[in-house]
């Protein structure tokens, strides 16, 4: 059954039956990720004239945050390299490291070092942020899409639960300001983005999956003319924090709350102080400048230079049109035809 035809009372079952990855699927994707991580750490930069060491590989995206949708087998792997010693280095040199990773992948394929097939895709831009490829193997029932992103290890040995040194953000803000590239280095803070969502209640992650599924359904009509999916994930967290904060809640009410927030996109101004705050004058000034921007403003909790909600009001208008239509579907209604009702928000919008 499609989501739009699913009664509100059955949304939890819909998530369980259609959106939660099963154990076999999760194991397969994990195996694929392990293959690529091993390649990056053990093989990729061996034998190069100028030794390059991989300091760590961090799993980002849905698989890192624990919000993967069933059937969508993709993984973001951020590769932190010792040769990238600044934000400027990352911007200037990531292209050469992407080329080297690609060269080694193709060599592995020719030598059949791994029992996998790499179908390397051509980069679509001059200075790509990522190398995209598809990994397939007789052991895997389906292909897994990868984005591998070389990055500068700005955080170093960061301990979960602690705020990074504000000076890291001061350097980030200076670099972004001088280049006019806000949010350009968000990959450096993948661990924080992952940490922000990772330990949330299971049911909130299920609601995020539902919202992502709705977003993907809308994308079939509008293509890439919608706001970033990450903005919808953060909007869902905000809805839960402001409207519920319970580990057990009505999924239908949560879903309706997110749809209604999309309708109010012109009033949204959302930020968190989990990893940075107003204490440091440079960071505080950057945050205030961001919060004065035209709505919607949804600041990346890991990167004060990244307003993931901004940039294109038309994209939000398209999504709002969809939200208005979806509020009339059974997934938002009680048996008597009335709306299930959104959560009462602590912060009025």
Swiss-Prot record:
Record-marked site positions (Interaction with dsRNA): 157
CDD domains the record matches: NT_2-5OAS_ClassI-CCAase
Statement: the UniProt record of this protein carries the keyword Ribonucleoprotein: no
GO molecular function, a single term: 2'-5'-oligoadenylate synthetase activity
Stated consequence of mutating residue 212 to A: Significant loss of activity
Interaction with dsRNA, as annotated region: 12-59, 199-209
GO BP term (any one): interleukin-27-mediated signaling pathway
Family: Belongs to the 2-5A synthase family.
This protein's name: 2'-5'-oligoadenylate synthase 1
Organism: Sus scrofa
Name of the gene this protein is made from: OAS1
